[in-house]
Structure formats: C-alpha cells, structure tokens
C-alpha cells in the first residue's frame, strides 16, 4: 500500500516540477532574447577551445596524440575542425570506433584505448562537434541529429576504414547505430553500452510516468541551457570522481559560449513518435532486427538509472547478441570499468565470451 501511495505521490509531483521548469525556461528565453536585442551582441559562429585547457591531462591517462580534419558540415562558411584519437597500427587486424555521448568526449575512453591497442587493434575515438577538442557552434539551433550522423559518415570516408567494430554509449549509440543503418558496409561488429534507440512514445498515463525521470532531466537541461554545470554533472554521475578527472571532463567548456552542443543534445531526444529523430530511431530498430546478422556484444552497467532496462530492448532486437552486466558501474561505465570493458571486447572478438 505504501508503494502505491509513493507511486501516486510521484505521479502528481513530477508533472508539477516539470511544468514549473518549463515556465522558468520560457521566462529565461524571453529575457535572453530581450537582452540580445538590446545589447545586439555578435557572437562567433564557431569557437575552438584553447589548447591550454587540455594541458596536464596526461596525469590522468589522456596521453594520445591529437588528429584533426576539417569537414564540410553545418552549412556555414567556416568548416568546423573535428578532433579524433587514432591509436594503434593502421594495418591492424581490427579497427575500433569508440563514440562518446552527452556531455563527454574521447577522454571517456582513455582507460579502454591502451588495452585495445596492446591487443593489436586500431582505435579511433572522435569528438563530436560541440564537444572535446572539436570545434563548437555557438548557437544550440546549429546542432541536429543529421549534423552528427553526417559528421561521422564523412569522418569514416576520410579515414578509409572498413570492418569496423562500433563501440558506443549514450548519444554515441543513437548516432553510431543510425550510421550503421545507413552505411553498414563500414561495420563488422557492434558493442552497445548504456544507450538506447528512443523512438518516442504515444501519450498515455503509463508511458508518461515511465519516462518521467528523463522528462525531469530534459526540463532541467532546457532551463539551464548553456549554463549547464558540466563539472557538477560529472561529480554527481561518477562513482569515485577525482578532481583532476572532473577537470578533464570540464576542460572543453571554458564558458557558456562553448556549451551550445551540450545544451542541445538532451532536447533532441524524441518524446513523441512523430519527430524526425524518432522516425530515424524506429528505422534503426527495424534495420537491426531484420538485417543486422553480424556479431553483437551488449554491456550495460548495474547502476545507470538513465538507460536501465534498455539492454532488454537490444536483446529483443538482436537475439544473436552476447550480453554482459558490468557491476559496480554507473552511466559512464568506461570511466568506472574501462579496463574490464576492453578485456570483454577482446574476448568477444576472439570468440572467448
């Protein structure tokens, strides 16, 4: 009986909180628009995080040489520069493509890369535009699902890779698996971690209640906008955060001007099934269930409230998948159990799982 009472208490409380946050977000937008009109502030369309922000990260394991390529995306006169880690031999027997999500960057994979390289693999870990060492558009509206998928396809073309094992987490899964659908010739295996393929939902009390925690996070993100406290977000999300590690995650964002991409991503997650992203996610689900017959490894952690239960969705879509539960790890499981994840991937490729 107490459980039922708590359920209905939350059912009433969450919409009230979300409505309040939506009102505050609207007020903020009005004030911001008015201030911009009065001040007539001109901001650059593309900014680049100063290199000194990344100094000292070798001390916490980010020791990789930077690689850059200018890609024709975004529709502006300035081509954004995309950063990627590229470690291991170019003629390696396998290539790993490691994709980060919100609001992280290739720094997230620093504990996984050495083990994979030592095993003889090539490891590529890009920073999506708006994150890490890649250039950043200063307006949230410049970011879209299509921007990120197009960027990834162009990067793969630039690198000339094939037979790739996709390693993806969070938004890296939404972007990466969409590209698998559209360009399957690049890929030979999938490693899916703490992500989902949200195709929106039809309105019902059950569905709205089920996604209420995400709606609360989305409303907070919309209210905070480019004031999102990345340092505090990781301090809350990581299980045992060290200040130097938190500095590493916060390094790409010296001011709100650099956070437009991080502010935008939560708002691109589809809530209803009729948005373009929702349609693409449903198409991706259909592709995986009907056409993807190659090997799959699913690794979800036991302490991630954000993607809890999504591993079951992938198991239904991909019945050939091997599934591993990573214990004592949160949403950013690469940070908590990076070396263990690498060991599982190596065993998976060598058919030892």
Kindly give the residue locations of the regions a language model identified.
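Flexible "cap/lid" subdomain of the alpha/beta-hydrolase fold that forms the substrate-access gate
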Residues: 2-67, 71-73, 82-90, 95, ...
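Histidine-centered active-site/metal-ligand motif
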Residues: 83, 100, 331
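Structural cue for short, hydrophobic secondary-structure segments
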Residues: 98-101, 125
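The serine-hydrolase catalytic nucleophile loop
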Residues: 102-113
């Amino acid at each position: 009986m107490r459980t039922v009472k708590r359920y209905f208490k939350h059912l009433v409380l969450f919409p009230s909180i979300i409505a309040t946050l939506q009102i505050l977000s609207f007020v903020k937008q009005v004030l911001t628009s008015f201030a911009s009109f009065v001040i007539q502030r001109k901001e650059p369309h593309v900014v680049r995080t100063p290199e000194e922000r990344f100094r000292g990260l070798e001390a916490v394991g980010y020791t990789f040489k930077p690689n850059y390529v200018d890609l024709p995306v975004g529709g502006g006169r300035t081509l954004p520069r995309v950063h990627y880690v590229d470690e291991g031999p170019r003629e390696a027997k396998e290539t790993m493509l490691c994709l980060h999500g919100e609001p992280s960057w290739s720094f997230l994979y620093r504990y996984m890369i050495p083990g994979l390289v030592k095993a003889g693999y090539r490891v590529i870990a890009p920073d999506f535009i708006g994150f890490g060492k890649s250039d950043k558009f200063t307006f949230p509206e410049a970011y879209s699902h299509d921007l990120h998928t197009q960027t990834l396809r162009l990067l793969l073309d630039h690198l000339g890779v094939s037979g790739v094992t996709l390693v993806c987490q969070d938004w890296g899964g939404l972007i990466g698996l969409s590209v698998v659908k559209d360009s399957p010739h690049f890929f030979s295996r999938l490693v899916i971690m703490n992500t989902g393929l949200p195709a929106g939902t039809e309105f019902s009390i059950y569905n709205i209640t089920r996604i209420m925690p995400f709606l609360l996070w989305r409303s907070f993100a919309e209210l905070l906008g480019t004031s999102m406290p990345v340092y505090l977000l990781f301090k809350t999300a990581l299980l045992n955060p060290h200040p130097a590690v938190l500095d590493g995650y916060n390094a790409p964002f010296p001011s709100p001007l650099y956070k437009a991409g991080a502010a935008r991503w939560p708002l691109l997650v589809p809530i209803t099934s009729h948005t373009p992203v929702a349609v693409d996610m449903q198409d991706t689900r259909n592709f995986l269930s009907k056409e993807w017959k190659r090997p799959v490894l699913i690794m979800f952690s036991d302490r991630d409230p954000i993607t809890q239960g999504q591993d079951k969705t992938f198991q239904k879509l991909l019945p050939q998948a091997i599934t591993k539960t990573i214990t004592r790890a949160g949403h950013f499981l690469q940070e908590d159990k990076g070396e263990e994840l690498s060991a599982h991937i190596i065993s998976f490729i060598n058919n030892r799982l």
